[in-house]
Amino acid sequence: MTYSFIVPAYNESSRIRPTLNEMLRYTAEQNWDAEILVVDDGSRDDTAEVIREYARAHSQIRLLQNPGNRGKGFSVRNGMLHARGDICLFTDADLSSPISEAPKLFEAIRSGVDIAIGSRWLRAELQTERQPLYRQAFGRIFNLVLRLFLGLTFKDTQCGFKAFRRAAAQRVFPLQKIERWGFDPEILYIARRMGLKVAEVPVLWAHSEGTRLHPFRDGMRMFVDVLHIRWNAFTGAYSAPAAPAADRM
């Protein structure tokens, strides 16, 4: 079994080193045949150069660069469509969920599901540091909107810790349209329409103050994205087959 870890990164030069060090340490400890794909989303700092430095020293690290700043959803799609592993997992650059939680998702996939998504709310006691109350409130409201408009009944669609069988990723991500924060419910909606099996798995998680999600601006965009998902479904955008194609730089 081979593994691909996708890490979307935007202006992460201050914290990408400890993240890569921990991922290298843990994957070696587990003796995994694994690659780490860091997708630089047009960073204005030296994120890309730091990753190149690591890639020169560690053959399992690869750098992908987006054509400018396109958003987290674009970065995840780009990484997934370049991934070579049998199981592909994307994780946030701050490792809000420790990489040591990955075996929980891998075990769910080995048990027969196509996609395993980390959840902060199936067992809330696993949150070692919670979000501010206003962000928790927004999350609950957004979750209700997803239930009403998209029929997604997961307790947590937004945790940035999700694993896919490669075959499932190659079916879902070519159809993804949303490039920024609202992509998570879109890929889950597409997966459900395809009849793919999705498991929600409780994971350790800690809030990071360095998050780049703007609660009002990006929150409003995410609600608009839900309407876009409904429109895309209505117009058949998620029905036509699409050939896997990734953006390279």
Task: Report residues per predicted region.
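Acceptor/aglycone-binding surface of glycosyltransferases and processive sugar-polymer synthases
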Residues: 66-82, 87, 99-181, 207-217, ...
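Acidic donor-diphosphate engagement hotspot in glycosyltransferases and nucleotidyltransferases
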Residues: 19, 47, 76, 100-102, ...
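Donor nucleotide-sugar binding loop of glycosyltransferases
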Residues: 12-15, 43, 72, 98
